[in-house]
C-alpha cells in the first residue's frame, strides 16, 4: 500500500485532509483511513464533458473513495453515520472549493478486512494492493492473503 498523496492535485490533498479530520472527529476507534479507487490508482478524472450524436452533454468526475477501518459493533451504522453526518459537514466546509462529486465512505471492522484479505476477496484485496494509507493509529496490522484449499474457496464462493 502506498503512503503518499503528493502526486495528487493540491486541491485533492486539501479535500483529503478535511475528510480525514472529519472522520477522526466523528467516528470512534478509527484504526486506518485508506484512499482507494481512481485517485489511488492515478486514473482519476478531474472533469470530463462529452457530447453524444444527439447533442446531449454528459459530465463526469471521479469521486473520493475512502475505506475507514474501525472497531465498532455495527459497521453499517458507522457507515450510515458517515453518509448522514460526515459528508454533509464536508460539503459545508468545502463549499465552493470542492468538486461536486460527494465522497464515498465505507466502514469496515478489522476482523472483516482481515477475513476478506485472507480469502483474497477481490474488492478489499484491490483496495489494500492499490490504496493510499491516509491515517494509521498503529494498532492494526493488515493480514496477508493465504493459499486456501479448494473446499474453502468453494465455501466462500457459495456464501457470496
Feature annotation, model-predicted:
Residues 1-61, 70-160:
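Catalytic core of pol beta-like nucleotidyltransferases
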Residues 65:
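Cell-envelope/extracellular polymer assembly enzymes that use nucleotide-activated donors
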Amino acid at each position: 500500500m502506498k503512503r503518499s498523496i503528493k502526486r495528487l492535485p493540491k486541491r485533492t490533498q486539501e479535500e483529503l485532509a478535511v475528510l480525514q479530520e472529519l472522520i477522526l472527529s466523528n467516528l470512534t476507534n478509527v484504526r486506518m483511513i485508506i484512499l482507494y479507487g481512481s485517485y489511488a490508482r492515478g486514473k482519476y478524472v478531474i472533469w470530463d464533458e462529452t457530447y453524444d450524436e444527439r447533442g446531449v452533454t454528459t459530465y463526469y468526475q471521479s469521486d473520493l473513495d475512502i475505506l475507514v477501518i474501525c472497531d465498532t459493533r455495527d459497521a453499517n451504522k458507522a457507515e450510515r453515520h458517515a453518509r448522514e453526518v460526515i459528508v454533509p459537514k464536508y460539503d459545508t466546509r468545502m463549499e465552493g472549493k470542492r468538486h461536486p462529486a460527494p465522497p464515498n465512505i465505507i466502514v469496515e471492522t478489522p476482523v472483516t478486512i482481515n477475513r476478506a484479505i485472507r480469502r483474497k476477496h477481490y474488492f478489499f484485496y484491490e483496495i489494500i494492493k492499490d490504496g493510499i494509507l491516509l491515517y494509521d493509529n498503529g494498532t492494526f496490522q493488515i493480514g496477508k492473503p493465504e493459499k486456501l484449499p479448494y473446499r474453502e474457496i468453494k465455501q466462500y464462493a457459495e456464501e457470496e
